[in-house]
Every structure is written in structure tokens, then in C-alpha cells.
A protein has these predicted regions:
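C-terminal ends of transmembrane helices
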Residues: 18-28, 75-81
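Hydrophobic transmembrane alpha-helices
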Residues: 4-17, 40-73, 103, 115-157, ...
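Juxtamembrane helix-capping/reentrant segments at transmembrane boundaries
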Residues: 27-42, 85-106, 170-177
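Short, intrinsically disordered C-terminal tails of secreted or membrane-associated proteins
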Residues: 328-336
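Active-site pocket-lining segments that scaffold enzyme catalytic pockets across diverse folds
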Residues: 107-114
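A basic- and aromatic-enriched beta-loop-alpha substructure that forms the phosphate/nucleotide-
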Residues: 58-96
């Protein structure tokens, strides 16, 4: 397998990260490194799909799968960076770099090496000479769909939860977050495993390179999760502590004690937020504090004095008197002259 495409991707990622380092010197946001990392993954997948020496089918799948996965992550991180302030990890990086400019440069360059290592499984999968859709190909596509949809779904659920002001200081227990405290890490691991399945058929020495991305994902998750949970305990206290006691840390699973435990049962179901139309109706129906409610003219009653009943029309029931026939008369009733 020719290593030249990997070297080209490394050079491209390094150039992108150097430009990003220059931009963040003015923007003062270290989250730009993660944004550019996702862009490098997407660009690397498209490049490998063009230049790899494998069959057409695996090259197309790598370009589509890797390109879409990187683009989704790029858009998610871009939206979060524009709307939300930098998280605690990036703030710590920025504070450390204020006294050491070269340290932030080294951080951005390390992200270029990280993106290149994560792209190696894409290149290996694109080098597969198998030109037919096998059972491994179908399994790889299925695992990829599960991983990517799980990543996207968990990110969307968490973003919607954070958008509601009433959820400040609370822990998201909605959707996938009911079953795992870190579903985004779990489904990212599943996503990267799909390229190992797509590369089945290559020699073991080459195929083993596809395990780089899942292994790195697991290492990153194990390193970041303790810091993330320590920050959550500091900001959310007992709410997050009870969440830890009932919810799996990584692999999605039923809350512990459900359905016998009341806390686990409450974590199992969280009412969905009201729709925008329902919220607008509730806002119009709920009076503001101190507002005076004026009844409509049709329902207005006199304030002083007794309530005078309104006259009512009484409809008399028409009673028909039956005709009394004389036994000896043959003249119809109504024609008798008086």
C-alpha cells in the first residue's frame, strides 16, 4: 500500500491547522481546532476516494461515509461555536496559551497529526480490491448508519435541552441520554468501527491499521470523561450525582433499578418540550402578573345590588283536546251549529 496519500493528507492538515492557529490569535477561541479537525477528516475521505488503488465500490463508500461524517461534525461544531461560549476544556487551553504562545501552536499542530491518524482507516478501507457488495460491506454500511445517526441524534437532543432556559443547572435525561451518560462517545466508536468492517479481505498487517481510529476514540473518551463528569458535578451537584447512580457511563443500557426504583423510573421518561404552537397558545392564555382581566360584554354581571333575573320566554305546550263523538250522531265534529 502506497503511503504517499497519507503524507499528502498530513501536509494538508498541517497547513489548515497553521491557518487556524493564526485565526484564533484574533478570535481567542481554541474550539476552532476541533472545527478544522472535522473538516480535515471530511477532506481526507474525499481525497482517498479519488486516489486510492482499491476497487470503485469501497472508494465510493469511503468518500460518502467519511465525507458525510466529517461534514456533519463540522456543521455541529460550527453551530455550537457560533451560539455557545467555549467550554471549560477550551477555556483552560486558552488561559494556558496566554503565557506561552508556542504551546497553542503545538496544540493545533497536534490536531493535524490526530486528523491524519484518524484518516488512515479510511485510506485502508478505500484500498480494498473487493469490487462486489459482500456481507461485510452490508454490515459495514449498517454499523455506519447506526453510529452516525446515534452521534447526530445525541448531539441534537443535548442542544435542544440546553436551548431551554428552564433546564439551566439540570442534567439532560432525554432520548439517548436516558440510557448513557456519554452516548456521543459510544456512537463515535461505533462509527469508526464501520471502516474496519469495510476493509475485511485485506492482509492482516494492513487491515489492523483500521483499528487505529476505534482505539484512539476509546482512549480519548477514557481521558475526557472523568474531567467532563467532574465539571458536571461542580456545576450541577446532586442532580448529576443521581444521574451517575442510575445511568450507564458509556454503553446505552436501562437505568438501574427501573421500573421498581422511582428515581430510575423518572429518569426513564422525561416529558417532551411543548411545541412552538402550543407554547404560543399557553403564552396568550396565561395572564401576566398584575394584569386585570376584563370580562366580555356578554358575560358581564352587575357589580352592585342584587342580581336581577332576566325574563325568560316560556313556551306553552300545545295540548290538543281529543274529539268526543256522540254515539247517536252521524255529523262530524266542528260542523255542529250552536
Amino acid at each position: 500500500m502506497n503511503p504517499q496519500p497519507v503524507v499528502v493528507v498530513l501536509g494538508f492538515c498541517t497547513a489548515v491547522m497553521l491557518c487556524g492557529w493564526l485565526v484564533q490569535q484574533r478570535r481567542r477561541n481554541a474550539a476552532l481546532a476541533d472545527l478544522l479537525w472535522a473538516a480535515c477528516i471530511s477532506a481526507g475521505a474525499l481525497y482517498y476516494g479519488l486516489v486510492a488503488n482499491g476497487a470503485l465500490l469501497p472508494r465510493l463508500l469511503v468518500a460518502m461515509m467519511g465525507g458525510l461524517g466529517g461534514f456533519r461534525l463540522f456543521m455541529h461544531l460550527l453551530q455550537r461555536m457560533l451560539v455557545e461560549p467555549a467550554d471549560s476544556r477550551h477555556r483552560a487551553l486558552r488561559e494556558r496559551a496566554q503565557s506561552n504562545l508556542a504551546w497553542m501552536l503545538a496544540f493545533f499542530v497536534s490536531r493535524a497529526f490526530s486528523a491524519t491518524l484518524f484518516s488512515v482507516p479510511l485510506y485502508v478501507a478505500a484500498s480494498n480490491p473487493e469490487d462486489q457488495a459482500t456481507a461485510w460491506t452490508m454490515l459495514a454500511a449498517g454499523v455506519y448508519l447506526v453510529g452516525l445517526s446515534g452521534e447526530a441524534y445525541s448531539d441534537i437532543q443535548l442542544a435542544q435541552f440546553r436551548d431551554q432556559p428552564r433546564n439551566r443547572g439540570r442534567t439532560c435525561r432525554r432520548g439517548l441520554w436516558r440510557y448513557s451518560r456519554h452516548p456521543n462517545y459510544f456512537f463515535a466508536f461505533v462509527h469508526w468501527c464501520s471502516y474496519a468492517l469495510l476493509a475485511v479481505g485485506l492482509p492482516w498487517s494492513v487491515w489492523s491499521l483500521t483499528l487505529l481510529a476505534p482505539a484512539l476514540t476509546a482512549v480519548i473518551a477514557l481521558r475526557r470523561i472523568p474531567a467532563v463528569e467532574a465539571e458536571a458535578l461542580r456545576t450541577r451537584g446532586e442532580d448529576y450525582r443521581s444521574y451517575q447512580e442510575t445511568t450507564s457511563i458509556l454503553v446505552p443500557w436501562l437505568p438501574s433499578g427501573w421500573p421498581n426504583d422511582a428515581a430510575a423510573a423518572a429518569a426513564w421518561y422525561t416529558p417532551p418540550p411543548p411545541s412552538r404552537a402550543r407554547a404560543a397558545v399557553n403564552a396568550r392564555a396565561t395572564p401576566l402578573p398584575g394584569a386585570r382581566i376584563t370580562p366580555s360584554p356578554s358575560s358581564r354581571l352587575p357589580v352592585d345590588g342584587p342580581i336581577t333575573p332576566q325574563p325568560q320566554r316560556v313556551l306553552a305546550k300545545r295540548v290538543e283536546t281529543p274529539a268526543i263523538a256522540e254515539p247517536s250522531s252521524t255529523v262530524p265534529v266542528g260542523e255542529v251549529d250552536g
